[in-house]
Amino acid sequence: MAPPFTDDPESQRPSTSRLSQDSLSSVSTTSLVFDRIQEEMDRDPSSSRSARRDLLSATKDEGDYEDASETGAFLGQPGVPLQRQPMDRGFRRILIIIGAVFVGAWLAGLGVFVLSGSYRHESDSEHDPDAISRGSGKAVTMDQVFGGFWSAKSRSISWIADPDGGDGLLLEVGTANGYLVVEDVRADKQGTDTTSRQTADTQPAKPRVLMKDPYFMYNGEIKRPEWNEPSPDLKKVLLAVNLEKNWRHSFQATYFILHVETAQIQPLVPDNVNAKVQLANWSPKSDAISFTMDNNIYIRRLNQANDVVQITKDGGPEYFYGIPDWVYEEEVLAGRSATWWSDDGNYLAFLRTNETAVPEYAIEYYIQRPSGKKPAVGEEAYPEIRKIKYPKPGAHNPVVDVQYYDVSKGDVFSISAPDEFPDKDRIISNVLWAGNKVLLKQSNRVGDFLKVILVDPSERKAKIVNSINIAEIDGGWFEISHTMTYIPADPSKGRQQDGYVDTVIHEGYEHIGYFTPIDNPKPIMLTSGSWEVEDAPSAVDLDNNLVYFVATKESSIQRHVYSVKLDGSNLTPLTNTSSEGYYAVSFSSRSGFALLSYQGPKIPYQKVISTPSIPIEFSRTIEDNAGLADKAKKHELPILKYGTLQLPNGISVNYLERRPPHFNPKKKYPILFQQYSGPKSQTVTKKFAVNFQSYVASSLGYLVVTIDPRGTGFLGRQHRVVVRSQLGVLEAQDHIAAAKHYSSLPYVDPSRLAIWGWSYGGFQTLKTLEVDAGDTFSYGMAVAPVTDWRFYDSIYTERYMRLPQDNAAGYDASAVHNATALGMSKRFLIMHGSADDNVHFQNSLKLLDYLDLARIENYDVHVFPDSDHGIAFHGANRMVYDSKSEFSVLFSWILSPMLTLSGLNNWLVNAFNGEWLKIADPKPIDTKKRRHVS
């Protein structure tokens, strides 16, 4: 389950009186007058009326009516002239001296005010995420967050292999030289060249223009490509037009082939120009393209005119070839391709998926018609129904196996290994060509037993080379990843036999192991320690036996880039580990160059650097986000406080506390707890982000706290796997313990604590409210929540919960079903899209039924018609966060505050303002009294 990308409007900030010793701009003469009046009133309550009266009289125009009650005794009676008495000279001299001192002090203060620049609503200093206070600037607004105002600019480099054996080539789109251009990264002049030292034999390669214009003509029609993939020899380009989105990653489109030298265009499917193709991939030799159409797999051979070979023939609604079905796309492959060419182009491996026994789930569309088909006459009023093969826990999974196509012989075959998992208990997560062999990873359906299988297609044999019982190791599960990398033998480089590098469990943490020979079940450990690698390896330099990876070695909430030798020696950072940082990285085809993306905690930037793999020194900043830095100076961003919280239950969790820009420890603040909490997820990081949480802290003036409870990632396996078979239960305990800790702090209002989340975070919100039963949290907001894990997909759920048949008590304990306990909170909000193909609307409806049965009424619901898990149809995403309309603005003073309950922003403000308590027990107005008053 991946959180949707969502990854906010101006709201009135609560006014607070603050006295700053550093800025005269924070105190006006008027405020001092009011303070003085208030002091006198506090001393003598009887004077309050006259003080107010004097202030009022000072604002009246001449000729305003004054009644006798507005005159004081010292003024004399109306109509009686005032009797003036001469002032003592000594007293007058003292007053003059005091006045002169006051004027001098005022002028001095004015000079300091002007010279210090305190009148400017910005800071001249660089954004400091560790600052303990903020300057006088603008608040973060919801419009800024939704409009991309705070989005860091970044360049996505598409590294591309050099057919001539070089390195550092990238594919640029929309350059001055042409629409598709292959450039040498060293020749890119769009950045600041900070360091560049290279020899004559390492000079940048000349650019190659693959496509001049951003469109092409075919049969007299202008077509604009929406996707492209150059052939490995860079002589042709696959172009896709008319994309139609399917699921999270997949789409179908019409494909064309561009011949670079002649600019000739031809359709991928010669006899069906407008064919809708689901996937197309180049062969390594650039002489063929495999593609899937109507769930069957084909090969288009380019060395023969109009030569299309259909490899499979039984593809259709229940059989998929070369592409994943819904659950494999979402939970296993995390992509749209299930086709793998051998390095020599002689074999094509592809996944066959049999969904015959998988139950269907129907999704109704009330507004739109995703199929694009017009309803039959007379049936226009009926919703369109889309049926998805969606396996739920305990139901039939799709049956998958890998098939192979021998290009020279033209035959298709399967290869089974002795003792591999049976059809009903098999998940295939990895397919990797290792020379002329294939490495497969299979696990059982609950994901706690892994088998690595080595397949030899030429001999048509397979054997299991490694079996890992993860349930026996730590009681947890196998984490799916797609970074396993083949290491070919090269005696000249000290590699006597083939092998591979992969992430393995080592002493309670995830580290990198090197398996050689390739059938050796015991790896050479390249990393170790009380820290973890992430999606490792990032790249492998075969020329220098170097493995590059990203890890949490410095801190669990930071990411730095490192290299290590294949023998486990010489672990070296590529990034500056003496300074806090969260880096992402991508490498060129031969690992000689890297795109470093610094993502925080300071303003993000990107630079291309040379690596230890090449003998030159190169560094160029390609994005410094100077504009974002300037915005940060001019705005009051939240104060960020990171740390480790020791909970009473003995558990340590990372936390992030976002404080209002002018945090006052003497005030009492409400807290919004924001979280996701899913297995191996991480929300507390050192990334720079200005988002909805930032808006809440900056503009609404609330505290926003996030913790990563047990079950989340990068604190070791034991911290993570302890939640197995009982999702949500321990996490709820941790959130409640954290909230109780905060409730005890002097600057927190314990009566105003709320929690919110989306997807898994929505589930965790409701589960926490249920377990807490109103003891700690008063409010909660859940978006697209799971409420019973029996309703989610099988592959994700069973990995953490096992089968319902084997863990019925665990499923019951995890489900949100105690409506009475849930109703003990002051109020909660549920939001869901009716066409959610991921977390079905069924989840929220089941919970609503529990609430009806228990007669619980202190909640609100907002359903978004035809929205999926991201809730975006017809502008719904903005509505999730803020639903204030012109109608509600104009008439909210007449109507109930229920009018603006739907958006998270408005709902939260109503909650912390106590509005929901006012309507908790509504009473009818006495009509007799109303008539009497009128």
From Swiss-Prot:
Gene Ontology CC annotation, any one: fungal-type vacuole membrane
The enzyme's E.C. designation: 3.4.14.5
Location of the region described as Disordered in the Swiss-Prot/TrEMBL record: 1-81
Spans traversing the lipid bilayer: 94-114
Glycosylation site residues: N354, N576, N818
Compartment(s) of residence: Vacuole membrane
Protein name as catalogued: Probable dipeptidyl-aminopeptidase B
Protein source organism: Metarhizium acridum (strain CQMa 102)
